Structures are given as structure tokens and as C-alpha cells.
Curated annotation (Swiss-Prot):
Enzyme class: lyase
One Pfam family this sequence matches: Chorismate_bind
EC number(s) given by UniProt: 4.1.3.27
Binding residues annotated for chorismate, in chain numbering: 323-324, 438, 458, 477-479
Pathway(s) this gene product operates in, as recorded in its UniProt entry: Amino-acid biosynthesis; L-tryptophan biosynthesis; L-tryptophan from chorismate: step 1/5
Nucleus recorded as keyword: no
A single MF term (Gene Ontology): anthranilate synthase activity
The record's free-text note on cofactor binding: Binds 1 Mg(2+) ion per subunit.
Activity regulation behaviour: Feedback inhibited by tryptophan.
Protein known as: Anthranilate synthase component 1
Protein's UniProt keywords contain Cell membrane: no
Role played: Part of a heterotetrameric complex that catalyzes the two-step biosynthesis of anthranilate, an intermediate in the biosynthesis of L-tryptophan. In the first step, the glutamine-binding beta subunit (TrpG) of anthranilate synthase (AS) provides the glutamine amidotransferase activity which generates ammonia as a substrate that, along with chorismate, is used in the second step, catalyzed by the large alpha subunit of AS (TrpE) to produce anthranilate. In the absence of TrpG, TrpE can synthesize anthranilate directly from chorismate and high concentrations of ammonia.
Amino acid sequence: MISPGFSHFTELAQQGNFIPVYQEWVADLETPVSAWYKVCSSQPYNFLLESVEGGESIGRYSFLGCDPMWVLEARGDETTQVLRNGQTETFRGNPLDILSQCLESIRPVNLPQLPPGIGGLFGVWGYELIRWMEPRVPVYEPQPEDPPDGIWMQVDHLLIFDQVKRKIWAIAFADLRGENVDLETAYRNACQRVTKLVLQLQLPLPPEATALELLTKTQLEGKELNYSSNTEQEKFLEEVAIAKDYITAGDIFQVVLSQRLSTIYRDDPFKLYRSLRLINPSPYMAYYNFGHWQIIGSSPEVMVKADRQLDGKLMATVRPIAGTRPRGKTHPEDEQLAEELLNDPKEIAEHVMLVDLGRNDLGRVCVQGSVKVNELMVIERYSHVMHIVSNVVGELASDKTAWDLLKACFPAGTVSGAPKIRAMEIINELEPERRGPYSGVYGYYDFEGQLNTAIAIRTMVVQEQPDGAHRVSVQTGAGIVADSDPQKEYEETLNKARGLLEAIRALS
């Protein structure tokens, strides 16, 4: 049964102009992947977000949607909005301000019985957006073949899976903005979209939704994946040496240098996501389809979160990850590597520095005295690597929003360095190309003003080529400090890419 009923809906219309209409049901036979095939696979713009918390246990909610109200794409000084009906408008100036302006007219009605993230913005904030937050930081200008600096979908209907209660919500928003809006028509339209989502889930799987066939470890032996890098190994080692000179000179304490590995893939990009979620599961699994290119993410690291508390206040969270070891082949070896990691002076010094940076970032927008480290230097294990992780929280000041929080923390210190501004200047000097989505963030901003973003690491950028094949790029970095060994830092970038490259190789 669809809720709320029309009588209750008319009462809610006094509270705002964007009202959720929904249907919920128990559905333990449907999965987010099968639902994506039924609802989203034929749409040019769509997304699927899932979570495997700590790399080991399933997160509670999954989100999927398509057919957005509008798409906003930022590239250099221009930001273009494309409406659902195809109408376009181009703006000049700060895309983050334009993004906020596009949302200004929405006054959502919040229903406490619904899960978080029930609608809003879903998309990607690329690294080069830093030019609008810290104008002194130089960035490469975009080229026609580059992904946009940022791209966002405004979603007004979606499906949410509750993996704990085995429920599905089909949600659509009734839009009451504009003059002389008829409540009954708006309500009926939202109900029709909810019903359409429900009926789509009752359809059989489309022909392209075949069982995923991954090569076994035996089949993969001796089978190499051909890829190229945007830098030579010797060049990377030279860049590390230059970065260490800057550290010795007192310019910085740390800087993250990266390389981009690229290969050609000739099948459906969504299969890459399915392979990645099996081979390299993470807390922030994501598939964003933007037509001719996709973001496929398995990030382990939250960038920033802003969660609405029962008292209406926003709680801010950053969760720095720094310190890496490969997983052991046996349990004793795994434990030994974890102990070694927690007793490595270089890794500990780097991690503590980034925790302090996270505290300072939150301190810029949180209530004085509210910023706390509530989890310090614990080991989190993933399929191919383990990390040292800490958690920093604070109460967002009453005059600050989730957008202020994002600007205060962007980009994360774990992918830039410290001090952050000077580190980013050095990144622009030493790295050969713009970073694009890598080290930016992906996630959502919902209608309650909550924000949930992951750092775009362990992430594939998939771009369609003229011959119909796909260029898949994976970018990974290493934190350079005073006593860094250049060769080990180079190897760390390859270790971090291993899970993603294996997901591609398993489909070869």
C-alpha cells in the first residue's frame, strides 16, 4: 500500500513543497544487482550504492536510481544543467555555488519512518574542484577527453534496500514547486512513479543479466593484464626524491604522489562493478553511470559525513586511513603483518599527522570543544590489504551546513598531504596530469541536509572509446614522508591497485 494517503499528504503539503510518497515491502529474494538490471540498465544516467562495512560485514542500506530530474556537469568555468526533458542551461562561475542554487527552491518534508538518503544529489566531486575552494592551488585545465570536474544527478525517485530487515522502499517525491500546482495531480504522479518501480521489480531479468563468470586463480596463473602508466617507474622515483627534498627544506611534512594505470576492456562496464564487489568489497561500493563514462568505486575511506541527530543537530565525521600492508596468506601471517604495521614508526607518525589534520579540518566548522577522536589506530582488513584507521567526530556549528563541512575538509589529507595547500602545489608540479575523479569524492547529499561521501580511491574511471571498447583507469597514491623509500612507495601504489586490476583480469 502506498503511503501517505492523500488526506495525510494534503496536511504534509503545509510543511514543504517536496513530499516523499512510498511503498515498502519484504523482499528477501531480490538483490540490489538484480534490481539494477530491471530498473536502471536501460537508462543512460543511473547509480547503485552498496556497502560492505570494514570490508567484512554487509552495510545496512543500498541505494539505486535512474532518470534524474536534472544532471549538473561542471567543466572548467562552465557548469551545464540538463533537465529531464532535454532542456539545457549553462552557467559560469563557482559550480559549488551553482549546485546550492539549484537546490534552493526545495523545501523537503521529512518522514521519520523512512531511511536516510531517500533522495537528493548523487554524484562525483572531482579533485580539480579545489580551484574553487582554494584559488591559490594551481590545477591542470580540462581537456575534451577528460571527465568533468564534477557531475551530479538530482534524484526524485529511487529504491532503497534494507539488508537488515530485508525490506525494499520504492520512493518518489511529489513536487509542489511552482504556481497553481494541483495537489491531487502531483500526488497521483508520485504514486504512478512508485507503482512503476514496484512493477519493474516484478519483471524477469533482462537477457544481459547473465551469471557472472570469473576466472579462477588457477585459470589466472600466468595470465597478465596489459596496462600502461601515465608515468615511468624511474620518473616516479625521481618525483619521490624531489618530494623528500621539499620535506627536508621544511615546506611540507608529507605529500601523496600517485600514478594512473590504464587498460582496455571490451565488455559491459556493469560487469566490472559486479566483479569488483566480489573481489574487492568495501564500505563504499559505487556504480555511477553518466552515459558514455562510468565511475566504479570500492573506496574504504569516508571523506566526510554529516548525520542529522534526533535533536536536529548535524554530527560531522572524518575517518582517516593511513598505513598499509598486504593481507597475509594465513591467519598467523595476517596477525603478524598487522602487529608489524602498528609498530612501524613511519606509519604511526604519518597516521597521527593525518588524524591531527582531520581534527583541524573539523575544527574550522564544528562547535568549539566538540571535536574528538573516538577511535584511534585500529586495523581494518580488506580483501587485499589492511589499513590503520581512526575516527574523528564533531558537532557542526549551527551556522554551518554540510556544504561548509565538505569545503573545509576537501580534499582529504590522506590523498593530498600536510600542510594541505603546499602539498597540493607540489602535486601539481610533480604529477604529469590532472587527477580528475581520483582523490575527489563520490556520494550523496540528501533532502535532510545530510552528506555521505567517500574518497575516490580504489576507483575505476571507465570511458567509452570510438571503437566501442572502454578505457579503464585506476589511480593510486603513496604518502611520501622524510624517511620514505622511493622503491617501496612505488610498490605501494601497485599494491593498492592490485584488487581493482584483479577484478578486470578475472573477466578477461
